[in-house]
C-alpha cells in the first residue's frame, strides 16, 4: 500500500514538474560583440549659451554640457488656446514631465491679409515664448511656411493661391513671401534663442515636404482635391502620415528647397542648436544640417482601423517608422518627435484612443532606440475664427470647425487624461535616468522581425545596454486587439560578455494583458550593483545625503531585488518588499554609502509628479507648480489627499480642502434638437474653472452664444465636457448657451469605419436615428493651494 502511494506521489511530482517545465518560456538576448559606432563632428548642429552651456549632437544622441540627454517634446499650439490660459497650460505640460514645447506658427493666421501681420492676443508668439522662459520650458518653433496641422490650406494664406507661382518650391516669387514671413517671425523671436540665454533650442523647417500636403480650402463640392504643393510634386503628395514607396523623381529639387528655407531662416536671425525636418515617408531633408524627425500613429483617422506595427520592437534608428527614408540612418539620432498618443477626429472617421496605447507606444519606441520622444499633440486646443468670417479648420478634410481636442494627454480645455499620467511614468524615468539610457544601444532577440501584430503568444521585448548594464523593455499591448491575454511563465536570459544573467533567478513572472514595463539590470545604485529588479525604476532623490531610489511594482509581478554581494555589506542581497509607501528598505555599499529603496504600487506611481526641486507629490489631482507655490486642481472634489516626499511627514498622507460650491444649471430641451442651458457660476478664488458636462448620443453637436458658433463636437461615445471659464464675460451678458444636435444614423460613415468600440455604440434595433440627451451638469474644478515651504501648516494629517 505504501509503495503504491509512494509511486503515485512520484508520478504526480513528475507530471507537475514536466508541466511547469513545459510552460516555462525562456527568452534569450545576447549582448553584441561588435562595438557600437557613434559618429561625431559631421553634423552642423549645436550651440552655446551665454552662461557657458553647450548643446551638441552626435549620430546617436544630444548632449548638454557634456551629459547625454533625452528631450521629451510635447506639441502645444499657442494660437489654438486663450492667451490668458497659456501659463497654466505650460505648467501642466511641465508637471507631465515634458521638457520642450514645439509650436506651429501658422502663416495664414498671422498674415491673413497680404502684408498685414498680427502678433496680438492669442497670436502673441513672443509672449508665449517669454512665459515658457519664465518657467524654464524650452521651445522648438515650427516656422513653416507649410505646416499642415489640420489647418486651412495647411497654414498657407488664401491669397497665396491667387499668385502666379509654384508654392513650396524655389520659385523666386514664392520665396519673396516666405522671406518676408521669416523676417517677421525673426523679429518676434529676437533675443529669445538659446544663444541669447533664451528657451528656443530648435527651429523646424517646413513640414512633410515631398511627403504630404493639405487640400486647398477654395474648392467645390465633388471636385477632386487640389493639394498645397508644387505642381511637380502632386503625384507624390499624400494625405496623412504613411509609407511612401514611390521614387521621388524631384528629390534633388525638394532638398534644394529645404536648404534654401534654412538659409532664409538663418538670415532672419533664427540661429539655434537644433534644426529639424520631417524624416519619415521619404520626405525631403537637409543633409547634415537638420535632424530628421519621425512619427507613428496607432489610430490614424486617414486609414481603416487595423493592428499597427507600432507595438513591435525594432532598431528604430536604422529602420525608422514609415520607411523608406531619404537619409543615411547611421548619421542621425532617432528623434521620434511626432508620436500619436492621441488623434484628431474627422466627420467620417472617429478613432477612439485606448489610453494604454500611449504607454505601450512609448515603451516600445524608447526600447527600440529613440533618443528623443515627443507627441503630436500633447495639448489640444480650439481653432480660432477667421477675421473675415469662416473657420481656420481644414474643412475639406472633414475636421471639426473649432474642436482640436486631439484626444491629447491634455485636452481641448486643459483637462488631463489617463494617458497624461501613464506617460508621466516614462518622463519621470527619463528625467532621472535619461543620461544613462541615451548612450545605450538597442539589442533585439532573434526572430523579433518575424513577430506579427496579431501574435498574442510571443513576448515582445528588447533591451538597451552598454557594458553589460541596461534596461529591459516589454509590452503586452496591441492596438485594435481586444483578445490579448496575460503572458505567463516568463523568464529572461541575458547572455552578457562576462556572465549569463537570468531574470528572475528562480521561478518565472507574468506580464499582464495590456501591460508595458521597463526593468533594470546590472545597474549601479550609488556603488551597489543591482543585478536585476522585477520592478520599474521611477526616480532618484537625495535625502539627507543618502540616495533614495523609487521603483514601482508592475501589476501582477512580485517585486524582487537582487544585488551583487561584492558591492554591498551584510549577508542579505535579495529583497522581496510588498509594494506601497511602507516598503522602504536600506542597504550599505562596500564603500559605506547608505541606499534607500521604496517600491510604490503602480497606482501610486501613476499619481506621482516630480516637482522642480526633485521632491515627489502623490495625488490624484492635477499638479500645477510655479516658482512660489504648488496648486492642486481637482474636478468635482473639494478635498484631496496627497503625499509630499521627502518632507517632515515622511510618507504620511495629507489632506487639504477648500469650501465646496454647488453651481446651478438649468437646461431645457426644445423642439427635439435644441438645448438651452442657463448657469449660475460664482467667481471664487478657489475655483479654477467650471465644466459643463453633457451626456448625449447623437452625430454632431454645436454650441452658440449670441448667435455665434463657439464650439463643436463630434460624438464618439463619451460625454462632451466644456470649459466655461473662457466664456464667462459673454455669458454675463447673454445668460445662456444654446446647443444644436443632429441625430445619429445607424449607417453613419464613421460607424462603418469602425473607430468607435462596439460597446460604445447605441442600440439601433428599435430606430434608425437616435438623439438622446440624458444629463447636463456643471462641475466645479477646485484649485487647492498647498504651498511648499509651509504645506504642513495648511493641511492636516489624515
Regions of interest found by a model, annotated:
Residues 1-25:
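Bacterial Sec-dependent N-terminal signal peptides
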Residues 24-100, 767-780, 784, 789-795:
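N-terminal carbohydrate-binding accessory modules
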Residues 40-43, 47, 141, 146-153, ...:
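Substrate-binding/catalytic cleft of secreted carbohydrate-active enzymes
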Residues 65, 564-565, 569, 704-710:
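Short strand-turn-strand beta-turns centered on an Asx-Gly dipeptide
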Residues 86-154, 158-159, 262-266:
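Aromatic-lined substrate-binding rim segments of carbohydrate-active enzymes
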Residues 163, 175-189, 196-204, 209-211, ...:
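Carbohydrate-binding surfaces of carbohydrate-active enzymes
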Residues 591-593, 743-751:
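Short acidic/polar inter-strand loop motif in beta-rich domains
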Residues 683-706, 714, 739:
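Aromatic-lined ligand-binding clefts that engage carbohydrates, nucleic acids, or primary amines
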Amino acid at each position: 500500500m505504501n509503495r503504491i502511494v509512494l509511486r503515485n506521489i512520484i508520478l504526480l511530482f513528475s507530471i507537475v514538474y514536466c508541466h511547469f517545465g513545459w510552460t516555462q518560456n525562456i527568452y534569450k538576448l545576447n549582448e553584441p560583440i561588435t562595438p557600437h559606432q557613434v559618429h561625431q563632428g559631421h553634423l552642423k548642429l549645436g550651440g552655446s549659451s551665454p552662461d557657458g552651456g553647450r548643446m551638441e549632437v552626435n549620430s546617436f544622441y544630444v548632449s548638454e554640457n557634456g551629459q547625454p540627454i533625452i528631450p521629451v517634446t510635447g506639441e502645444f499650439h499657442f494660437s489654438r488656446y486663450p492667451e490668458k490660459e497659456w501659463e497654466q497650460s505650460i505648467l501642466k505640460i511641465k508637471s507631465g514631465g515634458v521638457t520642450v514645447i514645439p509650436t506651429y506658427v501658422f502663416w495664414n493666421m498671422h498674415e491673413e491679409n497680404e502684408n498685414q501681420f498680427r502678433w496680438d492676443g492669442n497670436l502673441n508668439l513672443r509672449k508665449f515664448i517669454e512665459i515658457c522662459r519664465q518657467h524654464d520650458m524650452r521651445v522648438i518653433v515650427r516656422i513653416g511656411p507649410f505646416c499642415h496641422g489640420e489647418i486651412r490650406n495647411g497654414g498657407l494664406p488664401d491669397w497665396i493661391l491667387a499668385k502666379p507661382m509654384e508654392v513650396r518650391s524655389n520659385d523666386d516669387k514664392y520665396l519673396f513671401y516666405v522671406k518676408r514671413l521669416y523676417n517677421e517671425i525673426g523679429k518676434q523671436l529676437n533675443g529669445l534663442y538659446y544663444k541669447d540665454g533664451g528657451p528656443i533650442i530648435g527651429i523646424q523647417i517646413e513640414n512633410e515636404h515631398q511627403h504630404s500636403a493639405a487640400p486647398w480650402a477654395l474648392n467645390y463640392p465633388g471636385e477632386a482635391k487640389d493639394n498645397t504643393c508644387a505642381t511637380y510634386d502632386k503625384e507624390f503628395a499624400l494625405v496623412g502620415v504613411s509609407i511612401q514607396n514611390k521614387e521621388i523623381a524631384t528629390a534633388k529639387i525638394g532638398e534644394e528647397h529645404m536648404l534654401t528655407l534654412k538659409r532664409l531662416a538663418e538670415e532672419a536671425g533664427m540661429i539655434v542648436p537644433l534644426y529639424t525636418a520631417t524624416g519619415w515617408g521619404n520626405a525631403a531633408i537637409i543633409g547634415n544640417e537638420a535632424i530628421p524627425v519621425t512619427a507613428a500613429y496607432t489610430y490614424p483617422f486617414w486609414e481603416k482601423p487595423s493592428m499597427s506595427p507600432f507595438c513591435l520592437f525594432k532598431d528604430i534608428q536604422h529602420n525608422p517608422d514609415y520607411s523608406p527614408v531619404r537619409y543615411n540612418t547611421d548619421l542621425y539620432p532617432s528623434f521620434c518627435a511626432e508620436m500619436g498618443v492621441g488623434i484628431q477626429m474627422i466627420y467620417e472617421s472617429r478613432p477612439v484612443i485606448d489610453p494604454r496605447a500611449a504607454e505601450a507606444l512609448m515603451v516600445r519606441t524608447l526600447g527600440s532606440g529613440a533618443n528623443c520622444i515627443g507627441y503630436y499633440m500633447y495639448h489640444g486646443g480650439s481653432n480660432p475664427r477667421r477675421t473675415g468670417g469662416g473657420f481656420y479648420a481644414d474643412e475639406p478634410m472633414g475636421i471639426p470647425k473649432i474642436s482640436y481636442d486631439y484626444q491629447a494627454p491634455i485636452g481641448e480645455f486643459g483637462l488631463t487624461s489617463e494617458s497624461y499620467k501613464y506617460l508621466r511614468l516614462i518622463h519621470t524615468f527619463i528625467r532621472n535616468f535619461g543620461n544613462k539610457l541615451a548612450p545605450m544601444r538597442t539589442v533585439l532577440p532573434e526572430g523579433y522581425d518575424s513577430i506579427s501584430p496579431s501574435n498574442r503568444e510571443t513576448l515582445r521585448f528588447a533591451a538597451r545596454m552598454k557594458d553589460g548594464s541596461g534596461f529591459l523593455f516589454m509590452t503586452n499591448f496591441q492596438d485594435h486587439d481586444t483578445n490579448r491575454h496575460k503572458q505567463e511563465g516568463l523568464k529572461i536570459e541575458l547572455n552578457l560578455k562576462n556572465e549569463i544573467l537570468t531574470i528572475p533567478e528562480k521561478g518565472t513572472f507574468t506580464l499582464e494583458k495590456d501591460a508595458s514595463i521597463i526593468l533594470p539590470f546590472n545597474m549601479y545604485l550609488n556603488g551597489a550593483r543591482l543585478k536585476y529588479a522585477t520592478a520599474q525604476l521611477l526616480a532618484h532623490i537625495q535625502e539627507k545625503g543618502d540616495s533614495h531610489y523609487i521603483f514601482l511594482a508592475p501589476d501582477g509581478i512580485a517585486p524582487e531585488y537582487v544585488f551583487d554581494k561584492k558591492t554591498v555589506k551584510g549577508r542579505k542581497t535579495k529583497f522581496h518588499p510588498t509594494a506601497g509607501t511602507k516598503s522602504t528598505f536600506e542597504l550599505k555599499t562596500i564603500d559605506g554609502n547608505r541606499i534607500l529603496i521604496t517600491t510604490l504600487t503602480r497606482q501610486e506611481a501613476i499619481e506621482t509628479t516630480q516637482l522642480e526641486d526633485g521632491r515627489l507629490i502623490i495625488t490624484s489631482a492635477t499638479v500645477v507648480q510655479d516658482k512660489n507655490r504648488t496648486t492642486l486642481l481637482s474636478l468635482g472634489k473639494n478635498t484631496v489627499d496627497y503625499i509630499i516626499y521627502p518632507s517632515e511627514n515622511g510618507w504620511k498622507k495629507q489632506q487639504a480642502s477648500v469650501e465646496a460650491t454647488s453651481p446651478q444649471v438649468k437646461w431645457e430641451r426644445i423642439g427635439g434638437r435644441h438645448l438651452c442651458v442657463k448657469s449660475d457660476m460664482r467667481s471664487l478664488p478657489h475655483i479654477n474653472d467650471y465644466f459643463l458636462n453633457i451626456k448625449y448620443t447623437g452625430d454632431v453637436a454645436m454650441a452658440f452664444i449670441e448667435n455665434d458658433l463657439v464650439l463643436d463636437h463630434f460624438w464618439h461615445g463619451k460625454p462632451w465636457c466644456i470649459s466655461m471659464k473662457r466664456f464667462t464675460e459673454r455669458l454675463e451678458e447673454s445668460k445662456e448657451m444654446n446647443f444644436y444636435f443632429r441625430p445619429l444614423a445607424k449607417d453613419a460613415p464613421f460607424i462603418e469605419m469602425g473607430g468607435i468600440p462596439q460597446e460604445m455604440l447605441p442600440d439601433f434595433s428599435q430606430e434608425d436615428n437616435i438623439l438622446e440627451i440624458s444629463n447636463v451638469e456643471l462641475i466645479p474644478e477646485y484649485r487647492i493651494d498647498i504651498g511648499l515651504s509651509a504645506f504642513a501648516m495648511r493641511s492636516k494629517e489624515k
